[in-house]
Protein backbone atom coordinates (compact mmCIF):
# COMPACT_ATOMS: atom_id res chain seq x y z
CA UNK A 1 0.00 0.00 0.00
CA UNK A 2 1.63 3.31 -1.06
CA UNK A 3 0.00 5.13 1.84
CA UNK A 4 1.61 2.81 4.39
CA UNK A 5 5.02 3.29 2.78
CA UNK A 6 4.63 7.06 2.70
CA UNK A 7 3.55 7.15 6.33
CA UNK A 8 6.66 5.20 7.32
CA UNK A 9 8.86 7.46 5.20
CA UNK A 10 7.33 10.53 6.87
CA UNK A 11 8.11 9.06 10.29
CA UNK A 12 11.73 8.34 9.32
CA UNK A 13 12.40 11.59 7.49
CA UNK A 14 14.77 12.37 4.63
CA UNK A 15 17.28 11.60 3.27
CA UNK A 16 16.10 8.03 2.78
CA UNK A 17 16.55 5.26 0.21
CA UNK A 18 13.70 3.71 -1.81
CA UNK A 19 14.33 0.42 -3.63
CA UNK A 20 12.33 -1.79 -5.96
CA UNK A 21 12.51 -5.30 -4.47
CA UNK A 22 12.98 -7.00 -7.85
CA UNK A 23 15.48 -6.87 -10.70
CA UNK A 24 15.35 -3.44 -12.30
CA UNK A 25 18.49 -3.34 -14.48
CA UNK A 26 20.35 -1.32 -11.87
CA UNK A 27 17.83 1.54 -12.00
CA UNK A 28 15.47 0.58 -9.18
CA UNK A 29 17.07 2.67 -6.43
CA UNK A 30 16.22 6.25 -5.52
CA UNK A 31 18.32 8.12 -2.99
CA UNK A 32 15.69 10.64 -1.93
CA UNK A 33 17.06 13.80 -0.35
CA UNK A 34 13.55 15.14 0.34
CA UNK A 35 10.23 13.60 1.34
CA UNK A 36 8.74 14.71 -1.99
CA UNK A 37 11.39 12.73 -3.89
CA UNK A 38 10.69 9.69 -1.73
CA UNK A 39 6.92 9.90 -2.28
CA UNK A 40 7.46 10.25 -6.03
CA UNK A 41 9.67 7.14 -6.06
CA UNK A 42 7.02 5.14 -4.19
CA UNK A 43 4.35 6.24 -6.66
CA UNK A 44 6.52 5.37 -9.66
CA UNK A 45 6.91 1.82 -8.36
CA UNK A 46 3.59 1.02 -6.67
CA UNK A 47 1.12 3.28 -8.52
CA UNK A 48 2.51 3.88 -12.00
CA UNK A 49 4.22 0.49 -12.25
CA UNK A 50 7.37 1.89 -13.87
CA UNK A 51 9.36 -1.24 -12.99
CA UNK A 52 6.61 -3.80 -13.62
CA UNK A 53 6.63 -6.79 -11.28
CA UNK A 54 10.09 -5.76 -9.99
CA UNK A 55 8.48 -2.77 -8.28
CA UNK A 56 5.46 -4.53 -6.78
CA UNK A 57 7.27 -4.54 -3.44
CA UNK A 58 9.23 -1.57 -2.15
CA UNK A 59 12.07 -1.57 0.37
CA UNK A 60 12.72 1.53 2.45
CA UNK A 61 16.28 1.74 3.77
CA UNK A 62 18.34 3.95 6.03
CA UNK A 63 20.46 6.53 4.23
CA UNK A 64 24.16 5.93 4.80
CA UNK A 65 26.71 8.60 4.05
CA UNK A 66 29.96 7.40 2.57
CA UNK A 67 31.46 5.86 -0.54
CA UNK A 68 29.95 2.93 -2.41
CA UNK A 69 32.24 0.15 -3.56
CA UNK A 70 31.82 -3.21 -5.26
CA UNK A 71 33.36 -6.36 -3.81
CA UNK A 72 33.37 -9.63 -5.75
CA UNK A 73 34.23 -13.16 -4.66
CA UNK A 74 34.23 -16.51 -6.44
CA UNK A 75 32.50 -19.20 -4.40
CA UNK A 76 32.58 -23.01 -4.73
CA UNK A 77 29.94 -23.77 -2.12
CA UNK A 78 32.33 -23.89 0.83
CA UNK A 79 35.28 -21.66 -0.06
CA UNK A 80 35.54 -18.13 -1.41
CA UNK A 81 38.39 -16.19 -3.01
CA UNK A 82 38.28 -12.42 -3.50
CA UNK A 83 38.64 -10.62 -6.80
CA UNK A 84 40.29 -7.21 -7.06
CA UNK A 85 38.34 -4.20 -5.82
CA UNK A 86 36.33 -1.93 -8.11
CA UNK A 87 34.13 1.13 -7.83
CA UNK A 88 31.39 2.18 -10.22
CA UNK A 89 29.52 5.43 -10.67
CA UNK A 90 25.84 5.16 -11.44
CA UNK A 91 24.57 8.70 -11.95
CA UNK A 92 24.05 9.83 -15.52
CA UNK A 93 25.00 13.51 -15.25
CA UNK A 94 28.27 15.38 -15.23
CA UNK A 95 30.08 15.29 -11.91
CA UNK A 96 28.22 12.16 -10.73
CA UNK A 97 24.84 13.93 -10.72
CA UNK A 98 21.40 13.09 -12.07
CA UNK A 99 19.34 9.87 -11.89
CA UNK A 100 20.82 6.45 -11.19
CA UNK A 101 21.64 4.15 -14.10
CA UNK A 102 23.05 0.67 -14.50
CA UNK A 103 26.49 2.31 -14.28
CA UNK A 104 28.23 5.01 -16.32
CA UNK A 105 31.80 4.05 -15.51
CA UNK A 106 34.08 2.19 -13.13
CA UNK A 107 37.69 1.80 -12.11
CA UNK A 108 39.89 -0.79 -10.42
CA UNK A 109 41.40 -0.92 -7.90
CA UNK A 110 39.13 1.18 -5.69
CA UNK A 111 41.27 3.36 -3.40
CA UNK A 112 38.55 3.36 -0.75
CA UNK A 113 38.80 -0.44 -0.38
CA UNK A 114 42.17 -0.79 1.28
CA UNK A 115 43.73 -4.22 1.79
CA UNK A 116 42.71 -4.01 5.44
CA UNK A 117 39.08 -3.31 4.55
CA UNK A 118 39.09 -6.11 1.97
CA UNK A 119 40.17 -8.54 4.68
CA UNK A 120 37.39 -7.26 6.94
CA UNK A 121 34.83 -7.74 4.16
CA UNK A 122 35.98 -11.31 3.54
CA UNK A 123 36.05 -12.24 7.24
CA UNK A 124 32.88 -10.48 8.42
CA UNK A 125 30.62 -10.50 5.34
CA UNK A 126 31.59 -12.92 2.55
CA UNK A 127 32.77 -15.99 4.51
CA UNK A 128 29.87 -15.90 7.04
CA UNK A 129 27.42 -15.65 4.13
CA UNK A 130 28.96 -18.61 2.30
CA UNK A 131 29.10 -20.72 5.47
CA UNK A 132 25.56 -19.73 6.44
CA UNK A 133 24.11 -20.72 3.07
CA UNK A 134 25.95 -24.04 3.22
CA UNK A 135 24.65 -24.70 6.75
CA UNK A 136 21.10 -24.07 5.57
CA UNK A 137 21.45 -26.54 2.72
CA UNK A 138 21.61 -23.88 0.00
CA UNK A 139 25.22 -23.97 -1.11
CA UNK A 140 26.07 -21.17 -3.49
CA UNK A 141 28.45 -21.63 -6.42
CA UNK A 142 29.39 -18.70 -8.62
CA UNK A 143 30.13 -15.00 -8.39
CA UNK A 144 29.00 -13.27 -5.20
CA UNK A 145 28.78 -9.50 -5.59
CA UNK A 146 28.56 -7.46 -2.40
CA UNK A 147 27.41 -3.88 -2.81
CA UNK A 148 29.10 -2.02 0.03
CA UNK A 149 28.99 1.38 1.64
CA UNK A 150 32.21 2.50 3.32
CA UNK A 151 30.55 4.57 6.01
CA UNK A 152 31.94 8.07 6.39
CA UNK A 153 31.45 8.18 10.15
CA UNK A 154 33.09 4.87 11.08
CA UNK A 155 35.20 4.14 8.01
CA UNK A 156 33.88 0.58 8.11
CA UNK A 157 32.14 -1.38 5.33
CA UNK A 158 28.41 -2.04 5.53
CA UNK A 159 26.60 -4.47 3.25
CA UNK A 160 23.90 -2.78 1.18
CA UNK A 161 22.91 -5.65 -1.10
CA UNK A 162 24.01 -8.89 -2.71
CA UNK A 163 23.94 -9.84 -6.38
CA UNK A 164 24.94 -13.21 -7.80
CA UNK A 165 26.76 -12.01 -10.91
CA UNK A 166 29.59 -9.81 -12.07
CA UNK A 167 28.89 -6.09 -12.04
CA UNK A 168 28.48 -4.07 -15.21
CA UNK A 169 30.65 -2.04 -15.82
CA UNK A 170 32.92 -3.30 -13.01
CA UNK A 171 33.46 -6.60 -14.84
CA UNK A 172 35.18 -4.82 -17.71
CA UNK A 173 37.91 -3.26 -15.55
CA UNK A 174 38.41 -6.52 -13.65
CA UNK A 175 38.75 -8.63 -16.79
CA UNK A 176 41.38 -6.41 -18.41
CA UNK A 177 43.45 -6.64 -15.20
CA UNK A 178 43.01 -10.39 -14.63
CA UNK A 179 46.05 -12.38 -15.76
CA UNK A 180 44.89 -15.79 -14.49
CA UNK A 181 42.88 -18.08 -16.75
CA UNK A 182 39.28 -17.16 -15.88
CA UNK A 183 37.83 -20.35 -17.38
CA UNK A 184 40.04 -22.59 -15.23
CA UNK A 185 39.15 -20.63 -12.10
CA UNK A 186 35.42 -20.85 -12.85
CA UNK A 187 35.74 -24.59 -13.47
CA UNK A 188 37.50 -24.94 -10.11
CA UNK A 189 34.56 -23.15 -8.48
CA UNK A 190 32.09 -25.50 -10.18
CA UNK A 191 34.06 -28.52 -8.97
CA UNK A 192 34.40 -27.29 -5.39
CA UNK A 193 38.16 -26.89 -5.76
CA UNK A 194 38.81 -23.22 -4.92
CA UNK A 195 40.66 -23.95 -1.69
CA UNK A 196 44.24 -22.80 -2.21
CA UNK A 197 43.53 -21.06 -5.53
CA UNK A 198 44.86 -17.52 -5.93
CA UNK A 199 44.41 -15.05 -8.75
CA UNK A 200 47.09 -13.04 -10.53
CA UNK A 201 46.36 -9.42 -11.41
CA UNK A 202 48.24 -6.92 -13.52
CA UNK A 203 49.67 -3.92 -11.65
CA UNK A 204 48.40 -0.42 -12.26
CA UNK A 205 44.78 0.59 -12.81
CA UNK A 206 41.95 0.21 -15.28
CA UNK A 207 39.03 2.47 -16.06
CA UNK A 208 35.89 2.10 -18.18
CA UNK A 209 33.77 4.96 -19.49
CA UNK A 210 30.28 4.02 -20.65
CA UNK A 211 28.92 5.60 -23.81
CA UNK A 212 25.12 5.59 -23.86
CA UNK A 213 22.36 6.49 -26.28
CA UNK A 214 21.15 10.08 -25.90
CA UNK A 215 18.13 10.14 -23.60
CA UNK A 216 19.25 7.23 -21.41
CA UNK A 217 18.15 6.26 -18.75
CA UNK A 218 14.86 7.57 -20.17
CA UNK A 219 13.59 6.95 -23.69
CA UNK A 220 16.26 6.88 -26.37
CA UNK A 221 16.59 6.39 -30.11
CA UNK A 222 17.78 3.05 -31.47
CA UNK A 223 19.58 2.39 -34.73
CA UNK A 224 22.06 5.30 -34.64
CA UNK A 225 25.31 4.54 -36.48
CA UNK A 226 28.63 4.14 -34.60
CA UNK A 227 31.91 4.46 -36.49
CA UNK A 228 35.68 4.58 -35.97
CA UNK A 229 35.80 1.95 -33.21
CA UNK A 230 38.93 0.18 -34.45
CA UNK A 231 40.75 3.48 -34.74
CA UNK A 232 39.64 4.46 -31.23
CA UNK A 233 41.10 1.24 -29.78
CA UNK A 234 44.44 1.99 -31.42
CA UNK A 235 45.02 5.53 -30.09
CA UNK A 236 46.95 4.30 -27.02
CA UNK A 237 48.15 1.02 -25.45
CA UNK A 238 45.83 -1.03 -23.29
CA UNK A 239 42.48 0.08 -24.76
CA UNK A 240 39.57 -2.32 -25.23
CA UNK A 241 36.04 -1.34 -26.29
CA UNK A 242 33.37 -3.70 -24.96
CA UNK A 243 30.04 -3.87 -26.81
CA UNK A 244 26.82 -3.99 -24.77
CA UNK A 245 24.01 -2.78 -27.04
CA UNK A 246 25.21 -2.98 -30.65
CA UNK A 247 24.33 -4.80 -33.85
CA UNK A 248 25.14 -4.61 -37.56
CA UNK A 249 22.83 -2.81 -39.97
CA UNK A 250 22.18 -3.91 -43.56
CA UNK A 251 25.37 -2.14 -44.67
CA UNK A 252 27.56 -3.86 -42.08
CA UNK A 253 27.91 -0.79 -39.86
CA UNK A 254 27.65 -0.88 -36.08
CA UNK A 255 24.39 0.57 -34.76
CA UNK A 256 23.17 1.20 -31.21
CA UNK A 257 20.40 -1.08 -29.98
CA UNK A 258 20.30 -0.28 -26.26
CA UNK A 259 20.75 2.35 -23.58
CA UNK A 260 24.27 1.65 -22.38
CA UNK A 261 26.04 0.76 -25.60
CA UNK A 262 29.85 0.82 -25.32
CA UNK A 263 32.30 0.29 -22.47
CA UNK A 264 35.48 2.12 -23.45
CA UNK A 265 38.11 0.56 -21.20
CA UNK A 266 41.78 1.38 -20.70
CA UNK A 267 44.67 0.25 -18.53
CA UNK A 268 47.40 2.51 -17.22
CA UNK A 269 50.23 2.66 -14.73
CA UNK A 270 47.89 4.56 -12.41
CA UNK A 271 44.29 5.73 -12.37
CA UNK A 272 45.02 9.08 -13.98
CA UNK A 273 46.77 7.48 -16.95
CA UNK A 274 43.97 4.94 -17.39
CA UNK A 275 41.43 7.77 -17.30
CA UNK A 276 43.37 9.82 -19.87
CA UNK A 277 43.58 6.86 -22.24
CA UNK A 278 39.91 5.97 -21.87
CA UNK A 279 38.78 9.50 -22.68
CA UNK A 280 41.25 9.74 -25.57
CA UNK A 281 39.60 6.66 -27.06
CA UNK A 282 36.13 8.08 -26.43
CA UNK A 283 37.04 11.27 -28.29
CA UNK A 284 37.88 9.16 -31.34
CA UNK A 285 34.56 7.28 -31.45
CA UNK A 286 32.26 8.76 -34.09
CA UNK A 287 28.76 8.45 -32.67
CA UNK A 288 26.53 11.55 -32.85
CA UNK A 289 23.70 9.58 -31.23
CA UNK A 290 25.68 8.85 -28.08
CA UNK A 291 26.78 10.73 -24.98
CA UNK A 292 28.76 10.40 -21.78
CA UNK A 293 29.37 12.69 -18.81
CA UNK A 294 31.92 15.34 -19.79
CA UNK A 295 33.73 14.86 -16.47
CA UNK A 296 34.44 11.80 -14.35
CA UNK A 297 34.73 11.74 -10.58
CA UNK A 298 37.75 10.08 -9.07
CA UNK A 299 37.77 9.39 -5.35
CA UNK A 300 41.14 9.59 -3.63
CA UNK A 301 42.15 7.36 -0.75
CA UNK A 302 41.44 10.26 1.61
CA UNK A 303 37.89 10.61 0.22
CA UNK A 304 38.67 14.03 -1.19
CA UNK A 305 36.99 14.44 -4.55
CA UNK A 306 38.71 15.68 -7.67
CA UNK A 307 37.48 15.94 -11.21
CA UNK A 308 39.28 15.37 -14.44
CA UNK A 309 37.67 17.82 -16.83
CA UNK A 310 37.12 16.93 -20.44
CA UNK A 311 36.15 19.29 -23.23
Curated annotation (Swiss-Prot):
Organism classification: Eukaryota, Viridiplantae, Streptophyta, Embryophyta, Tracheophyta
A Pfam family assignment: GARS_A
Family note: Belongs to the GARS family.
Catalytic reactions of this protein: 5-phospho-beta-D-ribosylamine + glycine + ATP = N(1)-(5-phospho-beta-D-ribosyl)glycinamide + ADP + phosphate + H(+)
Compartments reported by the entry: Plastid, Chloroplast
Pathway assigned in UniProt: Purine metabolism; IMP biosynthesis via de novo pathway; N(1)-(5-phospho-D-ribosyl)glycinamide from 5-phospho-alpha-D-ribose 1-diphosphate: step 2/2
EC id: 6.3.4.13
ATP-grasp domain sequence ranges: 1-191
Tagged with keyword Phosphoprotein: no
GO biological process, one term: purine nucleobase biosynthetic process
UniProt GO molecular function: ATP binding; metal ion binding; phosphoribosylamine-glycine ligase activity
S-S bridge residues: none
InterPro entries, per database record: ATP-grasp, ATP_grasp_subdomain_1, PRibGlycinamid_synth_ATP-grasp, PRibGlycinamide_synth, PRibGlycinamide_synth_C-dom, PRibGlycinamide_synth_C_sf, PRibGlycinamide_synth_CS, Rudment_hybrid_motif
Protein name: Phosphoribosylamine--glycine ligase
Alphabetical keyword list: ATP-binding, Chloroplast, Ligase, Nucleotide-binding, Plastid, Purine biosynthesis
Presence of the UniProt keyword Ligase in the record: yes
GO cellular component: chloroplast
